[in-house]
């Protein structure tokens, strides 16, 4: 039944049938927790890895003892950093100890290691004034992966890859003769027995005794041409280091450094965890038949008798007793299974060691050694602590390698299983913390080299840690990561949802990940393990589809980086769903049967139905209720936040839902936000967690409210918290950020309660669009191809009006010829053009500007020529005044206009940090109010997008029986073929809810049914079918059929026509081809491409075609002559040769082809070089807008040259006022073809 639910300050009528049993986690905790881990533990790990650094003789030792982030010395606040273009960071100080072993002297010092970027409370970083997000990366987890291919005869050939976090790979493969080969670090393959010999089993006999007498292994040994350990070592050395003289010692040290040196080979905690999970003997022998008695060597106890089936519990006990090799019977063959000798330490020690906090399995032989040598509890604990790196090795060990070989052999007998690399149990997340840690490690290892060199060179007595450490490599690595890594992205700040989604994004791209070109279909596809972890719907359309995903709503990331999702635990004995909620990783979940969240339960939590629909990996089964292990916590568990905001998602086709999710992120914040009448109930949580709303840090009473700040008197100590609100700030995408208080003086607020609305929020709920009265009706063809017909009311009443703020900056630099100056005194500018410029030369706040208006007056010294006698005299009399300057003022760009809302001035004198060579920096902010207009893109939440085709007067729109006109008409043909029926249900329910005065919550997969909607319509006094008689606004006559009318939530997207429309008459040209540049940003022309040429050819429009391909494009002389002819009113001359044709000829000549162009009389046509053309143009005394170089002013400024932009032509020609006599009509203009 429909029931009221309090969401923030608003009550919604909810249609949810499933009670929320689990709280949704904080939606940006993936960012916050990861960074916190880095500061608390990650940094410590990196320093620990690199400790100690000693010189080559070993008598100087440098150690990092501890570190602190100096939070009291943060230079600027977050807001100041954005204003001043600096990085929000705190100084990192490291305590360093230097020990001289010869003299025994120890020096300790605190060393400053650079400013370390800090994460803001919203989970972002401020880097050089720009807000950035570090996207989490999905990578293949380190571990052992088995696979198989089928050969021509249908035989399975198994292969394996051992992937460390960093270090050499091991790859196993089988050929069709059953010989198993190994590749070490991508080199040529060797029989696997060679690796076994090198690891210690020299003879054939030893190998067979250890691995068991198995056909494949025997075949491999036959193929092997080495017979001893030494031969095997030399063979491996030859493969890895061809061309070097092989010796046994060098081979041993090579293998040791490749695999058994923690600095060169790192499995990481995850790798060790995955190795132990895959190779542990327990899981592999479970459910097999024992071929011999399995005996505990220590006690002599028989754990499993010969011929018995090994149960799961037995298998686990066998493993924890340290038995590492078990013979099992498979089809009358004895197969030996070898584990990697790791055990659960808690099962091997008979006293409590929980204070050691060991959660991983440990290496049994090392543990046995400790237990055999010591008996005292405290001593054993001490020894365990000391030997931690041996008990839980970071690198691979021999036991691991033997276990991988054994697993490879066993696969042929169905012992073990092959892996699916797209399974989320085999893919993990690297979040901010880990990515930063890796970057820091790179910086430190570069620094380590420098430290070692300095230790060798400098005087060992006088040296201090400060002199040894060079922080540059560390600072550079961090700076490079934040500034230019593929995973450090400029935050999408269009609206709160886009911000939130960006922080929850998972990318498979980036360093160490996939590349778009290499990624196949499998990696991109939806996988059963994504359920509740990654959204199957929200992903970009285009080349990145499936490679960039979004975290599901309830998902969390565990300590190993695997994504977990919560389930309710079912007590199988009672057949009851308990209140316990546990988080499962993808491979843990695979062992259970999971029921849906909407499975009906009685009041005791028992299943009502005898048969229950469950998921088992990718299958959907119906099983007796007693077999169910787990149950989903919520129906929206499998989708992401943006997708969970689409009402009636279950009635939409997936590809349209994808578009709906993506387009919500592009919705522009409107002037007056309104929450959707038909929502899903997640809007409040999304807005609160996104970080755009100020929340009360402590409970208390509101004592002061203004547009700019809210003050809350704390309940605990009576102090006052002040919350400053952002007013009309520019977001990263140029939309407007403005916060409005929603509490009143005297209100009591709780901790975490929302105090003010931000952009696109209404009473703390996300409000991306507007509730619009619309109908599915065609109107005079204006609905063709998804176009939308809108009422003038939407324009007049500012329903879809948004504010956009653009920022422009102007720098005054030092040039070779003297400093630039910001001034009101600009040469050749009328007083009228300076009417809004103040005495400093900067525009006043509140001025209305159009394109071409001056924002900041700036003059640059001109290049000097030899002075004449008169000029020297003037210079002597008037001093510097007569020096030549050029106008290089900042003007409003083409096509922009608006009102100046803010001006900021930064100068050297005020102590502002400016980049080198800059003396003064002025920033102007121009705001525009953009009303909805023809050509703007609008969309609903169901992927139903369209462009506005016409704005119709209100009185002409179709109107309802009560006289209310529709606000938007949509094409009914846009619904059936697209299969997004959710929009129709939304319209019906919205129609009923608006009449009843309700706000609705209809959660995804658990929302209102068709009957519910019909009941609401009836309650509101409408037809149960939701259709209404409409009349034509022009004639007043009824339309033939009834029309579906209702309220739809419609968004205005960030694709505004004002940003896209563009026109050019003359402008910059490309340097090589001399054709106009392309694109609005370059002030380019429209490309007349291949197909357009065909069109003109088809019509036989020869002269038009010739003109387009020559004088309107790249006939350099011709275009100037044409200009001259138009000015003089003469006929347009014959076109010349296009520059691109000359370039083609030159390119052919560069290939040593002798190319000549002949005219009708077979005489060669001589081309002029571009330089000669330039002379000719100079004679014409006309310079149309210059080359592409002249548009990139900064490029020239970098070099410090005083240059002359194309706009200031030396003769200062003003095109409009050219006197016709300026063109001498007897110019000798040669034609290129004579």
From Swiss-Prot:
Tagged with keyword Transcription: yes
InterPro entries (alphabetical): DNA-dir_RNA_pol_bsu_external_1 (IPR019462), DNA-dir_RNA_pol_su2 (IPR015712), DNA-dir_RNAP_su2_dom (IPR007120), DNA-dir_RNAP_su2_hyb_sf (IPR037033), RNA_pol_bsu_bac (IPR010243), RNA_pol_bsu_CS (IPR007121), RNA_pol_bsu_protrusion (IPR007644), RNA_pol_Rpb2_2 (IPR007642)
Keywords: DNA-directed RNA polymerase, Nucleotidyltransferase, Transcription, Transferase
GO cellular component: DNA-directed RNA polymerase complex
PROSITE patterns: RNA_POL_BETA
GO BP terms: DNA-templated transcription
GO MF terms held by the record: DNA binding; DNA-directed RNA polymerase activity; ribonucleoside binding
A Pfam family that the UniProt record links to this protein: RNA_pol_Rpb2_1
Entry's EC annotation: 2.7.7.6
Reactions accelerated catalytically: RNA(n) + a ribonucleoside 5'-triphosphate = RNA(n+1) + diphosphate
Function: DNA-dependent RNA polymerase catalyzes the transcription of DNA into RNA using the four ribonucleoside triphosphates as substrates.
Family: Belongs to the RNA polymerase beta chain family.
HAMAP family assigned: RNApol_bact_RpoB
The protein's name in its UniProt record: DNA-directed RNA polymerase subunit beta
Organism encoding this protein: Clostridium perfringens (strain 13 / Type A)
Gene that this sequence comes from: rpoB
